[in-house]
């Protein structure tokens, strides 16, 4: 088993801060049985989970887990945190006006609150939020959080989509853990609002929270993301799913959800017994 010391940020972080005395690379399990979920959907990819109670990692495709990709709309998490922290928006109820340009996604063609824009993953509304934040402020917070390669590039309103900014699945996993436990350099109120915006399913057995992302790399391949956590019995399990395909007709929205649901089901989730 080979691990890149430079990139295994969450694993290294946990060892350094000593979440448990038993936390070590021995707590990392490579689960190649998860390959079937990617093969069945004809995509490449990786999956990683951190069980916070046991301080254990489960990872499929460790090489990809430590490689960096454009964050696409998963960056809406950071964009929201920075905007609320700096007062560019007050909270998830702040209304962002529609720019009047009609787009294919009908949900985007209207005024939206920050919460609605997050739910609909509206690119133009969050581009406006990024412009309000501005380059210098945005860069300061990327540096403070050490978000991926921390590069904004030429355009303040598209750097998370044009492959200027890149982040690894492992780094995304670390970000999710820090967000959940109020360990990011933002006000607790701000982090709570963003956590609430991420809730997708909430019932007696589990609560599933995540943000999706979909963009294109330099080769024109689709890159899909799902980053977040699932809670059962008040215990969080952090996860990151990353997929890639050169097939321009691939239904990334369905594929990433099918893979995540399949993996979590195989692991025993959704029954409230974890």
PLM region spans:
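Bacterial N-terminal signal peptides that target proteins for export
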Residues: 1-12
């Amino acid at each position: 088993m080979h691990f890149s010391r430079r990139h295994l940020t969450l694993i290294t972080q946990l060892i350094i801060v000593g979440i448990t005395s038993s936390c070590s690379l021995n707590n990392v399990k490579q689960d190649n049985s998860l390959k079937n979920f990617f093969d069945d959907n004809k995509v490449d990819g990786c999956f990683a989970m951190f069980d916070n109670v046991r301080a254990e990692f489960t990872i499929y495709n460790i090489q990809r887990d430590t490689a960096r990709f454009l964050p696409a709309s998963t960056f809406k998490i950071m964009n929201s945190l920075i905007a609320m922290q700096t007062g560019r928006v007050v909270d998830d109820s702040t209304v962002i006006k529609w720019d009047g340009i009609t787009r294919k996604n009908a949900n985007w063609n209207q005024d939206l609150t920050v919460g609605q824009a997050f739910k609909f993953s509206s690119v133009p509304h969050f581009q406006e939020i990024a412009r309000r934040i501005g380059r210098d402020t945005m860069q300061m917070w990327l540096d403070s959080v050490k978000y991926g390669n921390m590069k904004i590039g030429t355009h303040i309103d598209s750097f998370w989509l044009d492959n200027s900014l890149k982040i690894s699945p492992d780094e995304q996993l670390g970000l999710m853990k820090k967000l959940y436990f109020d360990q990011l350099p933002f006000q607790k109120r701000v982090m709570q609002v963003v956590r609430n915006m991420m809730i997708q399913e909430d019932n007696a057995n589990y609560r599933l929270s995540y943000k999706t992302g979909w963009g294109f790399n330099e080769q024109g391949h689709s890159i899909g993301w799902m980053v977040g956590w699932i809670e059962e019995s008040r215990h969080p399990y952090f996860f990151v799913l990353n997929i890639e395909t050169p097939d321009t007709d691939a239904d990334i929205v369905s594929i990433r959800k099918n893979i995540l649901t399949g993996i979590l089901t195989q692991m025993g989730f959704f029954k409230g017994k974890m």
